[in-house]
Amino acid sequence: MLGAELADTGLFVRFGALHFAIASVAVLLSALFVLLPFALPRLLAHKNLARAGVAILFLRLGLMLCGTLLDGRSWRNELPFHLCPAALISGSLYFITRRPIFFNLLYFWHFGSFVAVLYPDLTRAHTILYAYLFMLTHCLEPAMVVFSLLHLRERISKRGLQCAVLGFLLLAANALFWNRRLGANYLFISKYPLEILRVIRPFFVYQLLFVSALCLLMLVLYLPFRPSQHGRNQLFVI
């Protein structure tokens, strides 16, 4: 029944029944990902974490292939040059290598996943599989953050913030480069993503405000982890 919305019209209605159903499944699977180690502590072994990281990378690859081969999307729009896939890949590399810098990148870059789940770029789709993979890969980003904080006791560092901001600026430069050549809008930095934003003119002012706002948001995300007067991390350690 729910799939008929997609099969009959090719349209994915935001906040429709299908949107709610797919998002709910993705949230439940992501919650299960976080909660399973309480029942099965052996899942926290390094080899199992590495397998999870590889599996998540394959999920992302599956999303790209499904989009281009089954859903009729242009490969130009499926390359992982947005912030969300960069965060997901960083999280996967953290699970594989356990290097804190990758967790820091995941943490500071994952906030876009919430917007993607609420306002998915699925206004036109042909396969329900793509919609499920899209929602699941985005829901896994905050789940990986919670998993790492809760089970692996990972923490954010000032150096991690600096690397995340610098990395984001490099991603923005990369997006501008490929947007010009492919006609895409990676990082939403070459075209207005929403009509309401067209009031911000000239366009370079929008670009400057957009980049500045995301850098400021990363700084805000760092505040719970800043050292206290006693030199301890301010975030409560569970």
UniProtKB/Swiss-Prot annotation:
Chief site of localization: membrane
Q: Which Pfam families match?
A: TMEM164
State whether keyword Methyltransferase applies. no
Task: State the superkingdom.
Answer: Bacteria
Its name, as the record gives it, is Uncharacterized protein TP_0381
Lineage per the UniProt record: Bacteria, Pseudomonadati, Spirochaetota, Spirochaetia, Spirochaetales
Parts of the chain that traverse the membrane:
15-37, 50-69, 79-96, 101-118, 128-150, 163-183, 203-225
**Signal peptide, first to last residue:** none
GO CC annotations, alphabetized:
plasma membrane
- Record membrane topology: Multi-pass membrane protein
Q: Which subcellular locations apply to this protein?
A: Cell membrane
Q: Keywords in UniProt for this one?
A: Cell membrane, Membrane, Transmembrane, Transmembrane helix
